[in-house]
Swiss-Prot record:
Protein name as catalogued: 12S seed storage globulin 1
GO biological process: seed development
Keyword Signal: yes
Single GO molecular function: nutrient reservoir activity
Subunit organization: Hexamer; each subunit is composed of an acidic and a basic chain derived from a single precursor and linked by a disulfide bond.
Cystine bridges: 45-78, 121-324
SMART domains: Cupin_1
Organism from which the protein derives: Avena sativa
Its job: This is a seed storage protein.
Signal peptide extent: 1-24
Keywords attached to this entry: Disulfide bond, Seed storage protein, Signal, Storage protein
Amino acid sequence: MATTRFPSLLFYSCIFLLCNGSMAQLFGQSFTPWQSSRQGGLRGCKFDRLQAFEPLRQVRSQAGITEYFDEQNEQFRCAGVSVIRRVIEPQGLLLPQYHNAPGLVYILQGRGFTGLTFPGCPATFQQQFQQFDQARFAQGQSKSQNLKDEHQRVHHIKQGDVVALPAGIVHWCYNDGDAPIVAVYVFDVNNNANQLEPRQKEFLLAGNNKREQQFGQNIFSGFSVQLLSEALGISQQAAQKIQSQNDQRGEIIRVSQGLQFLKPFVSQQGPVEHQAYQPIQSQQEQSTQYQVGQSPQYQEGQSTQYQSGQSWDQSFNGLEENFCSLEARQNIENPKRADTYNPRAGRITHLNSKNFPTLNLVQMSATRVNLYQNAILSPYWNINAHSVMHMIQGRARVQVVNNHGQTVFNDILRRGQLLIIPQHYVVLKKAEREGCQYISFKTTPNSMVSYIAGKTSILRALPVDVLANAYRISRQESQNLKNNRGEEFGAFTPKFAQTGSQSYQDEGESSSTEKASE
């Protein structure tokens, strides 16, 4: 009897270790902050001269705009990132699509809903219709037809949210508000999840997009109508429609009558109630330049019943419980989430795989910084990641220095501009009079920075005599250098008044003549 139990025990032990290892690999537990899942940048890359970027071109759709930054630029290629910015107008629907590389989305403004479709996960949102036959109803017969719709979880998004987009995962977005949704997408094309060429590719499930010179169509357009209709079990006429051959609306379409699907009820006083679901309908009482029509009420003779997916009589395995229930978004703008706060300088908020586990799937992280008037950020360098800095509001003087001690960037970064800061390059930032807010996207799920000044900084950690001999200064000066910012962390209050208008400005620098962004 003992001999028969041992092989079974050994078999189940192997299965447990295999599953445990697979889950650890899936959620990034095999990576330490000092390791990277990236393929590395192009060899021979040089970040000798950095520049602030703005969108290079625009693609107009029926209900929005997609703006592309120049991913062919050497700085984007060397950092292995691709950036786009989308504007989705009210009642606009970003059609389902997926990408070859993982990415992060930051919602600059607006609100709406987004859905991420994970393969193999159950459709936990269930909707039941009772559609009445109008002809039979007129004849006194009350026969009805039961219809059913199931879909995966839908997430409410708003300003300040960061949404994680794993590679190959279908996502869509709908604007149910009265103002446009503006979102920045940053993709890590050098991530190991991308085994295609190191550039961002969009795979549309519907619609089309004229990103390049040629007109890009959705993935169904390349199949023959006959084979497609047979594979999907639909008529050839329906197969031709989903190919969107003559659809000129683009990738963002307008749903003028409102979009209906199940959503979690959001309470004003509390968190999301997962047991109550409602259909989406556009705002009727709002009248803006983006509004096309009013939202329809339910069709006559139609009743709707909602059922929470929690009541399903269905067993869940470990993958569904850990993978399918992951949160797709976190809000990084909430002041209560700040990791460091100085009431006279500003606050810093980090999103990493520790407080946002889904980032293990995309192997990226984000940091949002709010600097008050004339506040300065401690000089630092990124230890294990490149950084893509996007200015949300205000202006800041940014200086970046390379390993030769040469200034590779020294300019004012304005609202809407983007700056790529290479790994290990030292950066110094100071807010202008109006202050500034920006977000930095990092190419690792647990980004690490090394501050030069302040609490827990490099200068604070070095002995006084090491500083005195290294810089040929007195012990008192060394003590001041080490401790003057010793009680501050991250964001500093300005201590020394600037003399004249020559602060940070090199002779002949043209940035002083540039106009303000606002």
